[in-house]
Structures are given as C-alpha cells and as structure tokens.
C-alpha cells in the first residue's frame, strides 16, 4: 500500500508506523493518495520521481458546482473522513486538520501547505498538509467538527427518550402525531446542524474564502470544505 510504504521511507518525509506498538492501527486521511509522476515547480517536463519525492493529493474537484463553471475552476474540496471508533450507528468525522492525523505524512520543515509540483493541472505538496491549513488552525478545525459530530450523535441516537416516544406515538396514530408535530415542535437535530454550518460559514469562514459544504450533500460520507484553488508561489506574487 503506497501510504504505508511512504510512511516508512527514510528521508525528508516522516511519519509513524501505521501499527502503533504493533497492535493499534493509526488513523490517516483515507481520501489522500500519492503520485510519483508529475511536473515540479519551475520545470516544464513531467517525469517520474521516487516515492520519497511523491506528491500527496490532498484536494479534489468541487463536485458541488457545475463542471466547467467559474466556481468549479476557482475552487477545490478538502475532505475530512469518517471515523468509526466511537460508534458505527451514526456519522462521525475526523476532528484533525488534514495533515495532523497520527499517521499523516509529514515534513519537518512544513507547518502549512507548501506547493511542490503539478498533477492534473493542479498544485500539490509532498506532505499530508492540505491547503486548508492556510485558512484554519488545528484548534478551530477540532472545535467546529466536534460540534458537528455532537449534532449527528443526537440526531441518530435511536434509544433517546424523544425518539422512543415519537416512534410509539407514530405506531399508535399511523404517523399522524409526527405530521402534526412537524408544524409546531422545535427544529430537529439535523436541521439544527444545517443552521450551525450556515452560521460558521457566515460568521467565520466565508470572509476567508472557504466554506463548509452541508454534510447532507455528501450523504454524511465525508465532511467537505470548499477552498480557493491553490496556486504556486510565482502566481501569488
């Protein structure tokens, strides 16, 4: 598996063994992958590189806007993966900023996303640090995702008192109670989650040029964050 091989390689990249102490597997972002055939910054030719020089693909096409649109060309998606340690019964996302996971590919001289080469027309670095690290701190990421996970846990808790009561009433009234309560009761946890995501975007993220995509749009398979398309240093200056 390329990820584990790169993690164990010696040189500029470093990372722990994927099996901590030989027993417990370490977590890494399952969405990222490595490529060894790419064009380095400042070069014109695509060539093969060693695994230790591989680019780490950490951002992806924005599937939430029409392909070929201006927004599609100017934005990318960073994905925070699902985690299953706490429960298999409700969605839960990684609270780690991509590049800070226990088994992430790291470079000692990098604290933020550092472009190294081009692949498929986009710029990538050689570590697991995604461009999101240029906009959000690890602490901010952790706080926001923990709140999102909290809403999801409550929404999918089948043994909660409210769920048990509503299910019993629905059976007895042929779902009439749910139809009536939908007009009067407070918003559901999933609706509150949508409100929270919108609030975070409006108050904090949109001024930085990024935004959280509603988890509902990804079917809760990943927590997707839209970022500006990364550009090489020469294009920024």
From Swiss-Prot:
It is found in: Endoplasmic reticulum membrane. It is a peripheral membrane protein. It comes from the Eukaryota. InterPro entries: Golgin_A_7/ERF4, Ras_palmitoyltransferase. Belongs to the ERF4 family. Keywords: Endoplasmic reticulum, Membrane. GO terms for biological process: protein targeting to membrane. Interacts with ERF2. The keyword Hydrolase does not apply. One of its GO terms (molecular function) is palmitoyltransferase activity. The ERF2-ERF4 complex is a palmitoyltransferase specific for Ras proteins. Palmitoylates RAS2, which is required for its proper plasma membrane localization. This is Ras modification protein ERF4. Its main location: endoplasmic reticulum. It comes from Eremothecium gossypii (strain ATCC 10895 / CBS 109.51 / FGSC 9923 / NRRL Y-1056) (Yeast). It holds the Pfam family Erf4. GO terms for cellular component: endoplasmic reticulum membrane; endoplasmic reticulum palmitoyltransferase complex.
């Amino acid at each position: 598996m390329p990820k584990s091989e790169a993690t164990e390689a010696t040189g500029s990249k470093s990372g722990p063994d994927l099996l901590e102490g030989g027993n417990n597997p370490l977590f890494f972002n399952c969405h990222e992958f490595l490529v060894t055939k790419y064009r380095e910054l400042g070069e014109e030719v695509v060539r093969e590189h060693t695994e230790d020089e591989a680019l780490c693909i950490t951002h992806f096409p924005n599937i939430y806007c029409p392909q070929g649109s201006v927004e599609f060309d100017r934005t990318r998606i960073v994905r925070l993966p699902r985690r299953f340690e706490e429960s298999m019964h409700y969605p839960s996302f990684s609270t780690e900023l991509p590049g800070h996971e226990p088994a992430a590919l790291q470079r000692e001289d990098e604290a933020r996303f550092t472009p190294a080469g081009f692949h498929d027309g986009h710029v990538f670095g050689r570590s697991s640090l995604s461009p999101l690290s240029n906009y959000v701190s690890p602490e901010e990421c952790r706080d926001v995702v923990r709140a999102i996970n909290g809403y999801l846990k409550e929404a999918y808790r089948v043994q909660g008192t409210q769920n048990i009561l509503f299910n019993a009433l629905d059976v007895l009234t042929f779902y009439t109670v749910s139809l009536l309560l939908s007009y009067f009761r407070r918003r559901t946890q999933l609706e509150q989650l949508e409100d929270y995501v919108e609030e975070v975007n409006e108050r904090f993220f949109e001024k930085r040029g990024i935004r959280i995509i509603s988890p509902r749009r990804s079917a809760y398979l990943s927590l997707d964050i839209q970022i500006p398309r990364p550009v090489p240093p020469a294009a920024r200056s």
